[in-house]
């Protein structure tokens, strides 16, 4: 089991990590 980390910034409203959604200003698990 790999852990999904969603710490990227999403100022453009898009998250490139699978399973993450934009919760400005960073991506979070959906």
Curated annotation (Swiss-Prot):
A Pfam family assignment: Cyclotide
UniProt modification remark: Contains 3 disulfide bonds.
Expression sites by tissue: Expressed in root nodules but not in seed.
GO BP: defense response to bacterium
Disulfide-bonded cysteines: 6-20, 10-22, 15-27
Keyword terms: Antibiotic, Antimicrobial, Disulfide bond, Knottin, Plant defense
InterPro entries, A to Z: Cyclotide, Cyclotide_sf
Cross-link annotation Cyclopeptide (Gly-Asn), location: 1-30
Family statement drawn from the similarity comment of this UniProt entry: Belongs to the cyclotide family. Moebius subfamily.
Role, per record: Probably participates in a plant defense mechanism. Active against Gram-negative bacterium E.coli ATCC 700926 (MIC=0.6 uM) under low-salt conditions. Not active against Gram-positive bacterium S.aureus ATCC 12600 up to a concentration of 100 uM under low-salt conditions. Exhibits immunomodulatory activity but no cytotoxicity in vitro.
Protein name as catalogued: Cliotide T19
Species this protein is from: Clitoria ternatea (Butterfly pea)
